[in-house]
Amino acid sequence: DPDATESETGTSEAGQSTQRRAAGDGALFARPQEFTDRSTPSSLGVAAETLALLDGFRTDRRFREVAEAVVATHADRIRASPLEHVSLVRATERVESGGVEVTIAADEVPEAWRETLGKRYLPGALVAPRPATDDGLQPWLDALGLDEAPPIWSGRDALSDEPTAYVCEGFTCSPPRTDLDEALSWLADRE
């Protein structure tokens, strides 16, 4: 509706949706949801995967709860025809497995580490740099309006003032490593 001036986002039995309302009207207009992937990915699947991916940056579980609700709501549809719902399948995989996360604690990421990450195939991995110390992290938290560090950064300081990598997969994390290749080899060792 071109005259819509307010929007609301919520979860219904049909899943995550955005509704627009004309000023003073009170009537809600629901935008149709695209469940299947066609020439473009399903917006519902992309949104659910993105929320699951970004959940580690929140101190509550709100993003994850919405992503879980979306994939649970559409579980039968996903199982019945996974090739038509690839984006929802990807979202389901991210919700269930947590994916791969690489947190780098360093005041400046070494160029060699950037090259390694650029050359290494880490499908769907989330790389999350952060300052080397909690004191350095505090201005970031203040800018984001957070009282405490989110899980992806919490307790992940640099070791001995050296850039440090924390590699996680499936909600399990490697020990902190000051050698990025060694940290990433932890992924291969898990297979």
What is the role of each PLM region?
Residues 1-191:
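Glycan-recognition and catalytic cores of secretory/periplasmic carbohydrate-active enzymes
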